[in-house]
Amino acid sequence: MERAEKREFVTELNEVFKASGSVVVAHYAGSTVAQMNDFRSKMRAAGGTVKVAKNRLAKIALQGTEAEGMSNLFKGQTLIAYSNDPITAPKVVMDFAKTNDKIVVLGGAMGTTTLNAEAVKSLATLPSLDELRAKLLGMIQTPATRIVGVVAAPASQLARVFAAYAKKDEAA
């Protein structure tokens, strides 16, 4: 890499660390190209990105960001997985690590909080923001449908009473 390319890469990585909802750092030593391509495609499908960076450049890019506390994670062959959704990157990394023992989660960051490997695992078990929104919307809609049912019930009961009187009058 030329010096200008390194500067550009550090600037790009710095923006990633500033703007991402969550960042996960993991070792990938021993993974095949096919496995890494599979991992990248799964992360892309979920809305995240995977980058492999030189540790020295990643540490420089971390300077001045909220995630600066995770600079000690960059030792050995490390990859950086990130997403705007705080849950996506940890979830995809942990799911992939279950089937591929070459991926070892070291930790990560979410905003100003530096996460260890256990915290990343815990974060991966949470539902995504879209799932939480769907649950919240369902909880909000449930009382409304019950109110509609309660309001509509007397009208339907009244209609049944009229129908019963009409049948009674016809029979008489």
From Swiss-Prot:
GO cellular component, one term: ribosome
Any one Gene Ontology BP term: translation
Pfam family, one: Ribosomal_L10
SUPFAM superfamilies with a match to the protein in the record: Ribosomal protein L10-like
GO MF: large ribosomal subunit rRNA binding
Matching Gene3D superfamilies: 3.30.70.1730, 6.10.250.290
Keywords, alphabetical: Ribonucleoprotein, Ribosomal protein, RNA-binding, rRNA-binding
Protein role: Forms part of the ribosomal stalk, playing a central role in the interaction of the ribosome with GTP-bound translation factors.
Protein family membership: Belongs to the universal ribosomal protein uL10 family.
Quaternary structure and interacting proteins, as annotated: Part of the ribosomal stalk of the 50S ribosomal subunit. The N-terminus interacts with L11 and the large rRNA to form the base of the stalk. The C-terminus forms an elongated spine to which L12 dimers bind in a sequential fashion forming a multimeric L10(L12)X complex.
Protein name as annotated: Large ribosomal subunit protein uL10
The organism of origin for this protein: Rhizobium etli (strain CIAT 652)
The organism's taxonomic lineage, starting at the top: Bacteria, Pseudomonadati, Pseudomonadota, Alphaproteobacteria, Hyphomicrobiales
Gene name of the record: rplJ
